[in-house]
């Protein structure tokens, strides 16, 4: 199961959904804009 918008995540084990990226500072899944 992947993590969606603003779900807590681990930047070293990024389980965010397609199109999202774990934000290292906030430890949340956010839209990947790049």
Curated annotation (Swiss-Prot):
It holds the Pfam family Toxin_12. GO terms for molecular function: ion channel inhibitor activity; potassium channel regulator activity; sodium channel regulator activity; toxin activity. The keyword Lipid metabolism does not apply. The keyword Disulfide bond applies. Keywords: Disulfide bond, Ion channel impairing toxin, Knottin, Neurotoxin, Potassium channel impairing toxin, Secreted, Toxin, Voltage-gated sodium channel impairing toxin. One of its GO terms (cellular component) is extracellular region. It comes from the Eukaryota. It is found in: Secreted. Disulfide bonds join 2-17, 9-22, 16-29. InterPro entries: Huwentoxin-1, Huwentoxin_CS1. Expressed by the venom gland. Shows only a very weak inhibition on human Nav1.5/SCN5A. Belongs to the neurotoxin 10 (Hwtx-1) family. 61 (VSTX3) subfamily. The presence of a 'disulfide through disulfide knot' structurally defines this protein as a knottin. Potent voltage-gated sodium channel blocker (IC(50)=190 nM and 210 nM on human and rat Nav1.3/SCN3A respectively, 430 nM on human Nav1.7/SCN9A, 770 nM and 290 nM on human and rat Nav1.8/SCN10A respectively). Binds the voltage-sensor domain of the potassium channel KvAP (from Aeropyrum pernix) and weakly inhibits this channel. This is Voltage sensor toxin 3.
